Amino acid sequence: MKRFWPVTDLARDERFQRIRIEDAIFDPRNLNPEAQQNGLAPNYETSSDNARGLMHGIFVGEIQALEGAGRTCFDFEAGNGRDEAPFGLKLDMARQCWDEARHVEISCKLGDHMGSEIGEFAEQTLLFEAACNADPVLRLTGVNRALEGLAIDVFKTMRDFGSSFGDPVLSFCEDWMLADEVTHVKMGSDWLRRLTADDPQRQKEALEFQKAVDKLFSFGGF
């Protein structure tokens, strides 16, 4: 198997449809002021459809998180060099793969529970692209600190949506996955400190990459 797998070669069946993140950002429907409102509020007429779309986004995001964590286990030789990953980091990422695989299964079943199906909404691949930076430290800040941190807000939103609509299944599952995301963020922060303790320039570059991913994922980078 080759290392540093390109995003174009991700394995997907015919149900999946891919879209570039810039296409989503500049979609006229998303630029409409009404699209900036809380589309999951109980009094919002399309809240159920919006929730299904968000759930599908969580599902494909968890697939990419699994793929990205797995690539970090495989892409780098074990070691302490800049182009290597310590064995302990690879082990932590292997553990995270188990979490992400569980999240994929849960999210897929939640999609069914909410009346959605795989491929009903398009997939964009920002998460996997951030997860496959050539520097393992930038992977940590781009995914574990930035995207996993933002995922905490997403899971909270879906948990609260489930509570407001009296759906204990959705609320419980989102709260369960939320607990894992907190540990992923902490793991990324811990390894960032360890790997850049004697390299402030590398730490600066990693934090700048985190900010860039934050802006991009929050639709503020274009």
What annotation goes with each model-predicted range?
Residues 1-222:
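Non-heme di-metal
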